[in-house]
């Protein structure tokens, strides 16, 4: 849409480079085309019309969500394999394929296709959920993590190195490679979860601001218009 056809032109950058390509150079070159740029990419925040905007989202379907936390660890993946996180997920799924038990924790796992109606079953009983973002990049935070905090599930997390700027990492278990994950899963226990009830609640409250992506986009644009 050409600039003179809209009252306000807004660019919202959502995906990491491995998914849609890296448009950083193009955005820098043509930044004046937009009135407002919403981005999680630090390298674009020096542009005069850019604002930091965390992707977030929450895919829990609250109308049918029935939490009953047990000794369960869950994991979800697709069959994709082109992003760094995709590749790691396939390794994890292969490692879990024959595992029904992780140090006394039952395993709930799924690889699509087929797609499931929703993700509730991954979080209703699980005290832990293995989270792998598509890339390890600062500020790249999606529903994969937010769903954990929203459902009061402790994430076993591979993702943004600066996640501590947004959430209390004392309520997370962070890993950087498959070997670290194996060690974590071999030593899972309930005590880690049960000792962090207050931190789980803190991260739940922090996560709320990121649940509704479209409402946040709308509110940010309205704020820009009001202040323009």
Predicted regions and their residues:
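Catalytic toxin/effector domains delivered as secreted proteins or via bacterial secretion systems
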Residues: 17-18
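Pol beta-like nucleotidyltransferase catalytic core
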Residues: 1-13, 22-104, 112-228
């Amino acid at each position: 849409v050409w600039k003179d056809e809209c009252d306000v032109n807004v660019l919202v950058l959502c995906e990491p480079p491995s998914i849609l390509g890296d448009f950083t150079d193009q955005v820098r070159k043509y930044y004046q085309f937009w009135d407002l740029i919403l981005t999680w990419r630090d390298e674009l925040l020096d542009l005069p019309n850019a604002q930091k905007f965390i992707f977030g989202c929450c895919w829990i379907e609250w109308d049918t969500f029935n939490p009953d936390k047990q000794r369960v660890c869950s994991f979800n993946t697709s069959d994709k394999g082109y992003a760094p996180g995709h590749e790691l997920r396939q390794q994890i799924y292969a490692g879990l394929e024959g595992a029904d038990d992780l140090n006394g924790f039952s395993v709930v796992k799924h690889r699509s296709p087929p797609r499931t109606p929703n993700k509730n079953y991954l979080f209703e009983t699980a005290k832990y959920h293995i989270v792998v973002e598509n890339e390890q990049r600062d500020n790249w935070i999606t529903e994969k993590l937010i769903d954990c905090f929203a459902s009061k599930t402790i994430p076993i997390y591979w993702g943004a190195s600066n996640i501590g700027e947004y959430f209390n990492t004392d309520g997370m278990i962070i890993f950087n490679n498959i070997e670290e994950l194996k060690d974590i899963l071999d030593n899972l226990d309930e005590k880690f979860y049960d000792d962090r009830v207050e931190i789980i609640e803190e991260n739940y409250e922090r996560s709320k601001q990121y649940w509704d992506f479209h409402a946040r986009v709308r509110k940010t644009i309205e704020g820009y218009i009001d202040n323009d």
